[in-house]
Amino acid sequence: MEFPDLGKHCSEKTCKQLDFLPVKCDACKQDFCKDHFPYAAHKCPFAFQKDVHVPVCPLCNTPIPVKKGQIPDVVVGDHIDRDCDSHPGKKKEKIFTYRCSKEGCKKKEMLQMVCAQCHGNFCIQHRHPLDHSCRHGSRPTIKAG
């Protein structure tokens, strides 16, 4: 038993399938089956008005213009490689910035290690007062137990 009044026929000239759940194109307002409802599948003449996507750079939040026929991922990738201001790979921040205060030592550390007595900044090797010959008024004493 068929229900010719139920559903709608696909508007694609080569299809005309009776579809019980047709999809109406929001650009040309015609009904299509699931295979022909995308703009490209039925060659929608009004798709240029609707199918507009502007990708945004995930690093700097800048909209990236994409020309027709270009792949958005490739264009955004090119932007990140060339023009992006927030590219983390381009930042040349120095990691080892804390130089040892011990005379003759040229080591640098990521973390600041300040002597509690003389308040100088030292590397791991010279961080203890005895190791950097701390010249503060109170000398550290070693207790034998």
Curated annotation (Swiss-Prot):
Pfam families: zf-AN1, zf-C2H2_ZFAND2. GO terms for molecular function: zinc ion binding. One of its GO terms (biological process) is proteasome-mediated ubiquitin-dependent protein catabolic process. Zn(2+) 2 binds at residues 25, 28, 42, 44. SMART domains: ZnF_AN1. Gene3D superfamilies: AN1-like Zinc finger. Zn(2+) 4 binds at residues 115, 118, 132, 134. Zn(2+) 1 binds at residues 10, 15, 33, 36. Zn(2+) 3 binds at residues 100, 105, 123, 126. A zinc finger (AN1-type) spans 4-52, 94-142. It comes from the Eukaryota. InterPro entries: AN1-like_Znf (IPR035896), Znf_AN1 (IPR000058). The keyword Nucleus applies. Keywords: Cytoplasm, Metal-binding, Nucleus, Repeat, Zinc, Zinc-finger. GO terms for cellular component: cytoplasm; endoplasmic reticulum; nucleus; proteasome complex. The keyword Protein transport does not apply. It is found in: Cytoplasm; Nucleus. PROSITE patterns: ZF_AN1 (PS51039). This is AN1-type zinc finger protein 2A. It comes from Homo sapiens.
